[in-house]
């Protein structure tokens, strides 16, 4: 009688142990699934940031090359002239505007060359090397874009308002089309600068969360 009761207790304890083992396996499986979901969420977030990086680079390319092209084609000749003088305004009459065209062309060229690295960050969201490479060069070309845009802005301001202290006369009353073109080029260059800042901030955040 006692042996039968001991056997029943042993079987009962064995069943409890088996159930406890199954419960532990189930809990472990749930933890693995939860961790996998977190990893997928982080990867998807980084991939989304990489896709946005690519889109912003396309926008910056359009702005930079558009600014360079608009400035390079800015030219206006007044319909009247004298025997010895012809009144013309062109970007190559100003060394600052020449620097602007060259700088924005370099910026646009760099952005085009940076697209493959941006694509790599989409394919491999966890890769830190391409992001670090991009953030360094983005900072360099942001400096170039900002300096050229700021210098051109100063000349555009003088073209619109002149400077009485230096006896510099405003020319936009006579060369209206020319001033519209150079003003549009400067605005486009600052759009590129803003997009550069966004790109750098995004890369920095992505590297910080790596």
From Swiss-Prot:
Which SUPFAM superfamilies does this one have? 14-3-3 protein (SSF48445)
Record-level GO cellular component terms: Casparian strip; plasma membrane
| Membrane topology annotation | Multi-pass membrane protein
Single biological process term from Gene Ontology: cell-cell junction assembly
- Tell me the residue ranges located in the Cytoplasmic compartment per UniProt: 1-48, 120-131, 206-210
Q: Which InterPro entries match?
A: 14-3-3_dom_sf (IPR036815), CASP/CASPL (IPR006459), CASP_dom (IPR006702), CASPL (IPR044173)
Q: Which UniProt keywords apply?
A: Cell membrane, Cell wall biogenesis/degradation, Membrane, Transmembrane, Transmembrane helix
Localization recorded for this chain is:
Cell membrane
Note the superkingdom of the native organism. Answer: Eukaryota
Q: Signal peptide span per the entry?
A: none
Which of the residues are on side Extracellular? Answer: 70-98, 153-184
Q: Does the keyword Membrane apply?
A: yes
- UniProt xrefs under PANTHER family: CASP-LIKE PROTEIN, CASP-LIKE PROTEIN 1U1
**What function does this protein fulfil?**
Regulates membrane-cell wall junctions and localized cell wall deposition. Required for establishment of the Casparian strip membrane domain (CSD) and the subsequent formation of Casparian strips, a cell wall modification of the root endodermis that determines an apoplastic barrier between the intraorganismal apoplasm and the extraorganismal apoplasm and prevents lateral diffusion.
The family annotation for this protein states: Belongs to the Casparian strip membrane proteins (CASP) family.
Identify this protein by name.
Casparian strip membrane protein 4
Species for this entry: Glycine max (Soybean)
């Amino acid at each position: 009688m006692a042996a039968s009761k001991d056997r029943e207790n042993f079987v009962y304890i064995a069943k409890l142990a088996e159930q406890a083992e199954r419960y532990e396996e189930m809990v472990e499986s749930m933890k693995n699934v939860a961790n996998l979901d977190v990893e997928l969420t982080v990867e998807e977030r980084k991939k989304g940031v990489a896709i946005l990086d690519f889109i912003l680079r396309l926008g910056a390319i359009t702005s930079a090359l558009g600014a360079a092209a608009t400035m390079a084609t800015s030219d206006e000749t007044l319909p009247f002239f004298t025997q010895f003088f012809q009144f013309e305004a062109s970007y190559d009459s100003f060394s600052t505007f020449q620097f602007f065209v060259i700088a924005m062309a370099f910026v646009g060229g760099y952005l085009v060359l940076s697209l493959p690295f941006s694509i790599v960050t989409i394919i491999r969201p966890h890769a830190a090397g391409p992001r670090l490479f991009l953030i360094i060069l983005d900072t360099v070309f942001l400096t170039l874009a900002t300096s050229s845009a700021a210098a051109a802005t100063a000349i555009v301001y003088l073209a619109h308002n002149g400077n009485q202290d230096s006896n510099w006369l405003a020319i936009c009353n006579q060369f209206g089309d020319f001033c519209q073109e150079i003003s549009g080029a400067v605005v486009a260059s600052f759009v590129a600068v803003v997009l550069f800042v966004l790109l750098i901030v995004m890369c920095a955040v992505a590297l910080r969360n790596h």
